[in-house]
Amino acid sequence: MQKITFDKSLCVRCGQCTLVCPSRIHQRQTSKDYPACVKGAEEMCIACYHCVAACPVGGLSVNGRGHDDCLEFDKTAAIRFEQIAHLIRKRRSIRHYSGAPLEDRMIEQLLDVVRWAPTAKNGLPVKWVIVNSASKVRELAGVVMNWLKTQPNTSPMVEVWDKGGDPVFRGAPCVIGAYTDDTTSHWSAMDTAIAVETFDLCATAMRLGTCWAGTFVRAAQSAEKSVIHQWLGLSETETIHGGLMVGHIGEEVYQRIPYRPEASKMWIR
C-alpha cells in the first residue's frame, strides 16, 4: 500500500491533486476543505505521482517522494506538432550499420527517457536486457538461427547465415530485448510495444539506426525459448515481448520520406 502525506501548512486548497488522481483516492467535500484520503482508498494508489506533480506548492508526497523528486518542465523546450510529425515520418527501419561500436552512455540516455513511456495502471513492468558487443550479438544470432533452421520456409535466411551474413540482427552492434514477468501484468505485450517504440523514436532523434528484431522475438517466444532464456539469463515466467537492433547508421541513406496510403478511418458521431 502506498503512503500519501499532506502538508496543511503548505496546502493552498487549489484542488489540483484531487482533480488529477486517476483513482480518486483523495477528495474534498467543498472548495474550503483540505484534501484527504478516502478511508481505505490508499490501496488503490498506483504511484503515478500525478498529485505530487500537479501541486503548485509541494504540499504532498507519496511514499516519501515529493516535489523535489519530480522533474521540472523545461518551458524553453516546447516541441511543435510539426517536429514530432516529421520525426515519426522520417524514422526508417535500418538494416545496414557502420560497424562502429555503440557507446553504453547512449543506451543509458535512451532508457532514462523510456522510464516515462506509459504503462497500464502505471505498472512499469518492462525490463531490459542489452547485448552491446558485436561478438555477443553474433553469438545470440547463432542461438536464434539454431531455432530458425527447424522452421519451414527459412532456407533463404539459413543460406545467408551459412555464407557469413546475419539475417537475424543485420550486423547491428547492439541488440535490446524488452521483457516482463507475465505473472505480474495482463498488459505486458502492449506495455512493451509502447516502451520499445518510445526507445525507437528517441534513438532516431539521436541519429541512430534501429530495426525491430522480429525473428529474435519469435524465437524467444517459441516452444524452444528456454535456450534463449538461458542465454539471456531470464526466468521461466519472463517473456521477451520486443526487440530492437541498434547502431550507428551505415550506407543506408534516404532522400525522401517513403509513400504511405491514407489512414483507414471510420467516424462515428
Specify the residue positions occupied by each region the protein language model found.
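Acidic, surface-exposed loops and disordered segments
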Residues: 1-269
